[in-house]
């Protein structure tokens, strides 16, 4: 069983436990009634539709490949730093076992900042989409390799009904076709293989031509330098998601400024 398989299986267990506390029907009703006073519908994808490269900056305490990244996880302070430095969106890890994330991190960050937040988790059930809306998320991550074609299409429709965005993540040619057929409006290429966690930043370049120009294209993971940013700009990406590089920077604002201006 790969790490990704384990993450997906643990997500199913988490959802089963959450449903014991709040049923699917209940979470649906709460989500439908939840209004974001600071953001418009589909604020996440609108934030990525600008002439210049957009930056999605990640708040994460740990990862399966790197272990503990930020022992003193000042998540609200980090989120404020990102927003002050010009981040367009914030990605918040909520997976608790391998990433040491928490729903509370997302809930509090979404209340604190004025830019859209995406719930970074391993979505395997529609329940998690409704849950994300109640936590203040403007978007959710949908990973093709842990979903069927039918699930992906249904989950995108649920997002649309709630006014939130779906960042559909792919890693290869087959998943690119799957995402396009499902009607994804935002497609992210993960440069990290979630089955073995190896990184190849050339993956974004390799898959770029398979994504129509009217779909927002995001390059995810492995971005460390201004050279990486220039390469991403060259392939016509609309946005980049940066995690560990910013989390390990002593001065996150200075590091983001450096990357944004490259």
Where are these regions (language model features)?
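An N-cap/entry alpha-helix motif that binds or orients negatively charged groups
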Residues: 2-70
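N-terminal active-site wall of soluble small-molecule enzyme domains
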Residues: 59, 66-167, 173-179, 204-207
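C-terminal helical cap(s) of enzyme catalytic domains, especially alpha/beta-barrels
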Residues: 206-210, 233, 248-262
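Glycine-rich phosphate-binding active-site loops on the catalytic face of alpha/beta enzymes
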Residues: 131-150, 188-197, 237-255
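Catalytic cores of alpha/beta
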Residues: 124-135, 173-182, 219, 223-242
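Conserved, mostly hydrophobic/aromatic
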Residues: 7, 57, 82, 132, ...
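Active-site beta-loop-alpha junctions enriched in small/polar residues
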Residues: 10, 60-62, 95, 122, ...
